[in-house]
Amino acid sequence: MSVRVSGKHMEIGDSFRVRIGEQIEQAVTKYFDGGYSSQVTVEKSGSRFSADCKLHLDTGVVLQANGQANEPQSAFDAASERIEKRLRRYKRKLKDHHNGNGQNSTEVAYRVMDSVPFEDEEVPDDYAPTIVAETTKQLRTMSVANAVMALDMTDEPVLMFRSPGKDDLNIVYRRNDGNIGWIDAANIKA
């Protein structure tokens, strides 16, 4: 039940720190009765402020949200509203009893790389894409509906998962038009 608050390019006052902690605690206890830890970062960039909020629940679920505004308090309020909305969806998901609590999960490597150049671009001989981040994530077994719900609870652009029964790899992702796309590897012909 810890809330860590930090500021980038700005100082966070004690009253704002207390307000953030109380608001996070209020949102979590409203929808979830387990333990949690949270990291809130408020950043000033130019004349705007952004607040990034990451919430780790005891069930292993990680919820992320961010907000932007002209005032740091307003930016945090926007992020807090999004976190509360995701907590509400998570509670509804738990009530539906569709989640298998991740007991059918596999650990996989997760890499984020720089974009590959197009075929008509000049590519130097020593070109190698830069790996921006490399972590290990759990590859869970879940239905497409649960995968869309899990994608909706985070700000991640892509979620890879295994389909139940067949063990095929599937991907759900956010499309540029705002909709969710689904790639079923079983339907891809080589």
Swiss-Prot record:
Interacts with 100S ribosomes. The lineage of its organism: Bacteria, Pseudomonadati, Pseudomonadota, Alphaproteobacteria, Hyphomicrobiales. NCBIfam families: yfiA. Required for dimerization of active 70S ribosomes into 100S ribosomes in stationary phase; 100S ribosomes are translationally inactive and sometimes present during exponential growth. The keyword Hydrolase does not apply. Keywords: Cytoplasm, Translation regulation. It is found in: Cytoplasm. InterPro entries: HPF/YfiA_ribosome-assoc, HPF_long/plastid, RHF-like, RHF/RaiA, Ribosom_S30AE_C, Ribosom_S30AE_C_sf. It comes from the Bacteria. GO terms for molecular function: ribosomal small subunit binding. Pfam families: Ribosom_S30AE_C (PF16321), Ribosomal_S30AE (PF02482). Its main location: cytoplasm. GO terms for biological process: negative regulation of translational elongation. This is Ribosome hibernation promotion factor. Belongs to the HPF/YfiA ribosome-associated protein family. Long HPF subfamily.
